[in-house]
């Protein structure tokens, strides 16, 4: 697919409420949508998924199931943004076939969304390890590793893989979180050790060989996307 910013439609919950099947169906028909990138949902703060499980279930599981149904009805390709948190977060280097074991309610809610997407074969699940650009946090963790990629690079990759199906990990190089923060920040980031954070995973890093292979097949420079 040839994709550019002019061909994309960015909507809001007012016009496209994922809990309102009828509204979504009318919108998709009116706009003649061929691809739907599902980024709506509930993420931060993580505590909300512990304190308000009804909201977490409604937005991340039921809302996603509604999107699957409306995409199926209209034969629309669905791209679902999931998270690397569905993996156990113990040994790292998780590939798309690694066993899954979410470590918090947010991750369980995203895996619940994945379950409904898996029923629809015209779909692509992206397990993304992403953070905001620029790095917005005042502190970064020592003793924990991951595969952060800034959201601006994820946004560059997604249009290139719209026609893929199945599951794909998206992330950057494996690094200790504090090292990532200091490498890409224009100011020194304070550190906090993993042991001081309750229930934080030790290593959520991703194996991104499949992503690299796709970029190479498209004759793209990996270093333009994976930092």
Regions found by a protein language model. Name each.
Residues 157, 161-208:
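Mid/C-terminal beta-alpha module of Rossmann-like enzyme folds, strongest
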Residues 11-22:
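Rossmann-fold cofactor-recognition segment
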Residues 217-227:
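Amphipathic terminal alpha-helices
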Residues 135-163:
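Substrate-positioning beta->alpha
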Residues 101-129:
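Active-site Tyr-X1-5-Lys
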Residues 21-59, 70:
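NAD(P)H-binding glycine-rich loop region in Rossmannoid oxidoreductase-like domains
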Residues 65-101:
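Conserved Rossmann-fold NAD(P)-dependent oxidoreductase catalytic core, especially the SDR/UDP-sugar
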Residues 19, 35, 51, 55-66, ...:
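Glycine-rich NAD(P)-binding loop of the Rossmann-fold in SDR/ketoreductase-type enzymes
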């Amino acid at each position: 697919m040839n994709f550019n910013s002019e061909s994309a439609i960015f909507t809001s919950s007012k016009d496209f409420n994922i809990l309102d099947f009828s509204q979504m169906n009318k919108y998709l028909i009116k706009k003649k949508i061929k691809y739907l990138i599902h980024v709506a949902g509930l993420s931060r703060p993580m505590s909300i998924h512990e304190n308000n499980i009804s909201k977490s279930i409604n937005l991340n599981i039921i809302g996603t199931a509604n999107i699957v149904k409306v995409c199926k009805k209209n034969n629309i390709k669905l791209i679902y943004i999931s998270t690397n948190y569905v993996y156990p977060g113990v040994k790292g280097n998780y590939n798309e076939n690694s066993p899954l074991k979410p470590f918090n309610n947010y991750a369980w809610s995203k895996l619940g969304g994945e379950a409904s997407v898996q029923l629809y074969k015209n779909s692509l699940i992206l397990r993304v390890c992403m953070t905001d650009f620029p790095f917005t946090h005042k502190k970064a963790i020592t003793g924990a590793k991951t595969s952060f990629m800034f959201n601006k690079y994820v946004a560059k990759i997604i249009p290139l893989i719209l026609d893929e199906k199945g599951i794909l990990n998206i992330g950057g190089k494996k690094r200790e979180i504090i090292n990532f923060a200091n490498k890409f920040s224009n100011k020194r980031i304070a550190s906090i050790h993993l042991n001081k954070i309750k229930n934080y995973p030790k290593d959520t890093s991703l194996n991104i060989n499949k992503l690299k292979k796709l970029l190479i097949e498209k004759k793209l420079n990996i270093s333009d996307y994976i930092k």
